[in-house]
Regions:
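N-terminal Rossmann-like NAD(P)+-binding subdomain of aldehyde/semialdehyde dehydrogenases
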Residues: 1-59
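A general structural signal for well-ordered alpha-helical segments in protein cores
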Residues: 2, 25-26, 32, 108, ...
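Hydrophobic packing residues within well-ordered alpha-helices of enzyme cores
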Residues: 5, 108-111, 137, 157
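Generic secondary-structure signature for well-ordered alpha-helical cores
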Residues: 10, 34, 38, 116-121, ...
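Residue-level signature of the cytosolic catalytic core of signaling kinases
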Residues: 18-21, 62, 129, 182
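Conserved small-residue-rich beta-alpha loop and adjacent elements
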Residues: 48-118, 165, 187
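Conserved NAD(P)+-binding/catalytic subdomain of aldehyde/semialdehyde dehydrogenases
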Residues: 68, 118-190
């Protein structure tokens, strides 16, 4: 994974990728694994009006999968922002379709191969491609759609999903500050 990320970024420290993408992904998946029984346990609620409780009524919430979740992940932390949400998605019993960033083609292809080797396409499907694929992906009738990325793109995602009344979770950013030293290639940096 760090090698693919480094190639996509023209060089990113292996240590940085291991800490930010790999270790953080493992932590998210472990949290889901360790808490799934508690998360899925039925939740008791108070009966209202309380007179119904006196008559023997009981109330509880039973959690059920939503169905198919769409996940659009960004270029800057391509692994953790793909694998991070997966723990919760799977813990809730859902399937997932993933659209990774076209700006990290090697990492996206590696993740696609990893999922294809370990899951059926009915459980996890990875769709790669550019902006047109992303626009088509956003307009699919998911049961929920997660997007992490720039605010300007998030507006398009929200608009496309609204045609199918798909609930959307947006994690919007848009700034990735860097330090450019006087020994840097200014043309390449800009």
């Amino acid at each position: 994974i760090p090698v693919a990320i480094s190639k996509d970024f023209s060089h990113r420290s292996e240590t940085s990728s291991l800490l930010t993408d790999v270790a953080s992904s493992i932590t998210s998946l472990k949290i889901a694994k360790n808490n799934i029984k508690q998360w899925m346990r039925p939740s008791k609620r108070k009966v209202s009006p309380s007179i119904l409780g006196l008559l023997g009524a009981k109330l509880r919430v039973e959690y059920q999968p939503l169905g198919t979740i769409g996940l659009i992940s960004p270029w800057n932390f391509p692994v953790v922002l793909t694998f991070g949400p997966l723990g919760s998605i799977f813990a809730a019993g859902n399937r997932v379709m993933i659209k990774p960033s076209e700006f990290t083609p090697r990492t996206s292809e590696l993740m696609k191969n990893m999922f294809e080797d370990n899951f059926s396409e009915e459980e996890v499907a990875v769709i790669t491609g550019g902006p047109e694929v992303g626009a088509d992906f956003s307009s699919l009738p998911f049961d929920h759609l997660l997007f992490t990325g720039a605010t300007s793109i998030g507006k398009h995602v929200m608009r496309a999903a609204s045609d199918n009344l798909v609930p959307v979770t947006l994690e919007l950013g848009g700034k990735s500050p860097v330090i450019v030293s006087d020994t840097s290639n200014i043309e390449q940096s800009s």
